[in-house]
Amino acid sequence: IDTITHQSFSKEVSMVLTHTEVNKDLTVLELVQLGRQPYTNWMDVLSAEDQDFIQDTLRICDLQDLQKRKITQLSDGQLQRTFIARAVVQDTPFIFLDEPSTHLDLFHKVHLYKLLKELCVTKNKSILFSTHDLDLALQLSDDVMLIKEGVFYHNTTANLINEGLFDRFFDTDSIIFDRDR
């Protein structure tokens, strides 16, 4: 990683972090357009294909009606969806997200996880995210990675449940994972 240029890295990995500083004067559209920056020329000119891709992503992320709004005028959930749209527009093989469903209502949480699943299936993306929304994440993830007391566990969701790892992970009788489902 030390030897790769920022531009090359930006073509491989897009990220959504929990705390991101960004120019407050940007509109939703301008912030999402920044995701295409690794692919633009020295004048940062976006192609017609870039513009179409951006508009499709704004629609998919339910942001089309907000694209001219300044990011300072957004709710926390709308801003989170804007950062997710920027990562999608960056069009990298790897997407890393830290708590991507933070500030999202239930509708947009479900929509987000379905979008991430669709990107994996249709666009062959590898997506790694951290979350406390285990119920939704377990339903839509192919593989799960858990860390407890410095020990790393990785397997399919079904295998981790069948092995009883989730039951041991929570150390409580109030949370039980159904092995029959």
Regions found by a protein language model. Name each.
Residues 33, 48-66:
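Conserved ABC ATPase "signature" region
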Residues 131-132:
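H-loop/switch region of ABC-family ATPase nucleotide-binding domains
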